[in-house]
Amino acid sequence: VPITLIIIFGLFWTQSKGTGAVGFMFGPVMLVWFLILSMLGVYNIIQEPSVLLALNPIYAFNFFSSQFSVAFLTLGAVVLCVTGVESLYADMGHFGRNPIKVTWFSFVFPALTINYFGQGALILSDPSAIKNPFYLMAPEWMTLPLVIMATVATVIASQACITGAFSVSRQALQLGFIPRMRIDHTSENQEGQIYLPRVNWMLMIGVMSVVVIFQSSSALANAYGIAITLDMIIATILAGFVMHEIWKWKWRYTLAFLAVFLTIDIVFFLSNIIKVPSGGWFPLLVGIIFVFLISTWKKGRKILFKKTKKETMEIDYFFKEMKKIIKARVDGTAVFLTPNPDGVPHSLLHNLKHNKVLHKRVILLSVKFRDYPHANGENIISIKKLPNNFYKVILNYGYKDLTKIPQDLARNLKGTFSLDPMDTSYFVGKESLVIRSGKEMNFFRKTIFSYQFRTSENITNQFNLPVNRVVELGSKVVF
């Protein structure tokens, strides 16, 4: 356990430096790893070729018909075979579907299958090998090199999962499912190479906690079985939504797909239910906590938006009152960020209240994150000219887009007017929440949301605004 904790700490500690320097080694190392798996499997299959009879489904049928309860519970162990493949698709956001499909069907799937057959062959010839079939497949002199190679392969697989967690967290952040957090780009050449400090350290604490709680991989298997089968059920349901809503499949075809695959997934899940007391409780607890935190953030944001919208002044009324309030207009462009494109931002009203001046050109900017990966062409920006040299601008981003508001504004406003970066100021609101008991959300959840809101990343950093051109104007909101 201490060695494992040291390796885990080292892995997470190096994340901030990026993987570009050593990333070129990952492919060759994994290639060698899967070749070793294949060779070990082939060697043992040659020793006991009768294991190939397992390809005949009649054996599985006879097993279920003669010993149904034992066979059913065996499914809970069989599902653990996917532990060898989750790293392959964990980082799909970087590689795409086709490279992973080609790699899986042409190389990884055959290698893993051959190795599993090899382990079966070893157990058939020597039943005592069931205590550790993988390492006993190899000659004794090869045990240490195999342990080292397995450790390196595990670290690389873990790296794929960590990078995948960064990608998914960034997309969830852009879609508004989790609070804003700092995103560092670790590569000048690849946009996808990112590092999220908060996610990184939370993952490290979580992984270390798992190691301390479960102590061994065999004990962890109980937790893994519940986690992976629940993930399979969720993935199947989401696939059903994609088929009907995106691919426009008819309901009867979608339901036929769900009936087949959900039946398989649910059977595997039920076979793991007995593992809940002995470790399966852990992923369920983690899942419940994350659902609670995400739903609290989403609901809190919705309530906060409604409250601020209710108190927002309408643009038409503002223009009527504008002449009474404004004594002077100064040179330059002011960009006021607002979540509500149809009202006057609180930051603008606070600016007028304290400074009693307004820039000659004013942009009311709303940034919207859409449910598609990239915004391009006509759907990236919407511009509406308003009286008094005001502009209402909606800037759209996909959930995989990098947000660089100054550059994106300047590029997309070229046809309307020229935006001088040294003559443009950005005004952002900084709300401070005052918690009150209410019907919309209980006090405890409001306290959690207040903490999430208070510790979320500054909008200046999230939108890559020039720090020396940003003015923050604070206000209190009764929540």
Kindly give the residue locations of the regions a language model identified.
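The structured alpha-helical core of multi-pass membrane proteins
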Residues: V1-F479
